[in-house]
Amino acid sequence: MLRARRLGKTIPDYALTTCQHAIAGRSLLLDFDRSFGSTWRPCPRLEHLSREESSPGGGSFRTDLAVEAHEVLRQSMGPEIPGVNTRTDETDFGSITRVAVTTEQAARALGKAMGNYITIDAPELPLRDRELEREVSQALARELVGLIRANLNNADFWAIPNFTTLICGLGNWNATPDAIGPLVAGKVMVTRHVYSMTPPEKRGGLKSAAAISPGVLGLTGIETAEVILGVVGRVRPNLVIVVDALAARSVSRLGTTIQLGDTGIQPGSGVGNRRFGITRETLGVPVIAVGVPTVVHAMTIVADALSIMGQAPQGISPEQQGGPHGIRDIAGGSELPPAVSQMLEPYLGTLIITPKEVDVLAKELSDVVAGGINYALHPAIDEEEIYQYLQ
């Protein structure tokens, strides 16, 4: 019998309609039956937002990466998906993949909002090569500038007087895999407090920038979107950049991938703890999201292991493998069958995995992301000066 206790009082089952346990200290959200007379109401500008989206293809795996959702969908719908345009460019450090979701039908199938998503893949990024990190930061800056201009009707934001950017580092700074956002917020070059006092001829390539790390609901008792909405109303920025940790479907993407998008972000969605959205509709200004995958769901690892077990070496028949037919059948698809998922759900349903060196990854990746944002917003600053600032 599910019960919740507060101040020594017991709340019976029938009154408890939702109980979402936090991952990494996010929150414990209790929605009570109307008979208890709850008077809480969300912010009016946030009421229309949906709390949950289906995973691509109706599968059981969550991913925040549009490129992974597209890969899963292609396996069930074929290589050409109406309303989804993709392009991959090879680079010296890896690749850059662009996914454009152009129709509502494609957005529902993909489980992603309509818009543009850019994925930067650098498989050797965890090796802590400084030159490689600078290359990725510069690539991130170029893509970020392109997204900003596209969302400002191709306007040159560097030439707009008093153009102000608010950088929001989302996440729980007490949980290392979720600390990417706060770390980045502490490393970007903030200039808003001195920009207005600097003579125009001495501003050079600096733009007005401010940063905030609003924390999470479990730490502050305030929705992240509500904090940012209040700051936006006071600071009145022209652009908001949100940085957050993401959940991936593939272990190989942990610490090697950076995603940009112009659709905003749903904090906590990757670990099943979706909060109110931070989007252009809620804030009234363009919102660019930058995310780095740091966790993967345990169910994904199980599926990958079964897939490896089901792959027969070339020239050996399935019967000679010695494995049960069930495993080979399971390994035939990219996701676990519903029966297997239901069997594992009590044990692995909410379990997420992160690398043991995630503290090092978080520090290095926050340097890369902060460096890219600094490059994009302050083009006249010398490269060496930017990296000295990050030290």
Where are these regions (language model features)?
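A structural-propensity feature for long, helix-poor, extended segments
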Residues: G204-V231
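Glycine-rich phosphate/diphosphate-binding loop of Rossmann-like nucleotide-binding domains
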Residues: N172-K207, A211
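An N-terminal, well-structured beta->alpha segment
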Residues: E104-L152
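Short glycine-rich or small-residue beta-strand-to-loop segments that form or flank ligand, phosphate
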Residues: T119-P123, T164-N174, A211-G215
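Gly/Ser/Thr-rich loops at beta-strand to alpha-helix junctions
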Residues: L170-D178, G218, A245-R249
